[in-house]
Amino acid sequence: MENMFRLMASEEYFSERRCVWVNGPVIVGAGPSGLATAACLHDQGVPFVVVERSDCIASLWQKRTYDRLKLHLPKKFCQLPKMPFPDHYPEYPTKRQFIDYLESYANRFDIKPEFNKSVESARFDETSGLWRVRTTSDGEEMEYICRWLVVATGENAERVVPEINGLMTEFDGEVIHACEYKSGEKFRGKRVLVVGCGNSGMEVSLDLANHNAITSMVVRSSVHVLPREIMGKSTFGISVMMMKWLPLWLVDKLLLILSWLVLGSLSNYGLKRPDIGPMELKSMTGKTPVLDIGALEKIKSGDVEIVPAIKQFSRHHVELVDGQKLDIDAVVLATGYRSNVPSWLQESEFFSKNGFPKSPFPNAWKGKSGLYAAGFTRKGLAGASVDAVNIAQDIGNVWREETKRQKMRRNVGHRRCISVA
């Protein structure tokens, strides 16, 4: 509280914007990472404020995902701390089921985010030793003053739109990002080019083919495609189990052998594997292997055509680097997402320029001066849950110690009053 008085004494404090003192941390982002952190803080008895730029929790899931989406991993690897999925949920919950789970999660732990508040800047005030988080909402500015700041905006805050020659200036067809794609129904009978071959690109291509779109998918570089299940068991679960006992290179070797037995060779279909194994590549770069849920069948049947990198677009065509020209009506950019942290967090010691913590897992959750990060480990919802537990315990330890000291001071003061009387 002394820090708060020191801040109020400065002229800058008395500005036109409204200021709010937060006893506990401010959590930026009401996605799964922010909700998990808030729930763990609630369990520790620590107050908090969650600010969210959208008008709902988990806005990526609610507003920027396609209709057919399901979790690609079994539900036990995707549940948040302190609340499992309902027993009646399938092994791979649907998008709607996952959203319902998150809403129930927020209700259970009394998480009430302050919606429609976009964080414009957050900086640590050296004079007061406090964080100053400035937000805007409908033109109104507000500043939150807090001791702890939890960055939970995630790895996928902003879509990535690559610069491709002629795409935005020459091409006359429809161009959308995968975050705007809902269903292949509107593209029935049309010639659609999907740019990107990650999990989203593969599933969008599958959905388009299922709706009888004439589908081509750009594959510029090598990619690991694994079956979602091997002999009825989750491929991810098998890899997690093996990594407990075996070195990473051997896990990769076994995974690739098993994948070859299930899927066969993919090189004849234009899908070349990287030289580095899938788990090692994930560990080194964060690049997730594709878990096949049906796209390979469409590729093998010719319903989805694999094409090389793009050279340029013209009015109704795309020219590829191998000289091919394709007639197309629409383009879906399955080109991924990025962190937006550098655009608003005024700090360079903990976060790098790409918006991810500089320290590798498992030390990427805590910075200095009360700064924390949840959900930036490139290890999915399980990694975000580990971050949330660590952050809440760390803040909770300080909170309980200070609460204990305050009670002791009050008790001493109370005894003095009695003795004087």
From Swiss-Prot:
Transmembrane segments: none annotated. It is an enzyme of class 1 (oxidoreductase). GO terms for biological process: auxin biosynthetic process; response to ethylene; response to herbicide. NADP(+) binds at residues 196-201. Pathway: Plant hormone metabolism; auxin biosynthesis. One of its GO terms (molecular function) is NADP binding. Its cofactor is FAD. Gene3D superfamilies: FAD/NAD(P)-binding domain. InterPro entries: Auxin_biosynth/cation_transpt, FAD/NAD-bd_sf, Flavin_mOase-like. Involved in auxin biosynthesis. Belongs to the set of redundant YUCCA genes probably responsible for auxin biosynthesis in roots. This is Probable indole-3-pyruvate monooxygenase YUCCA9. It comes from Arabidopsis thaliana.
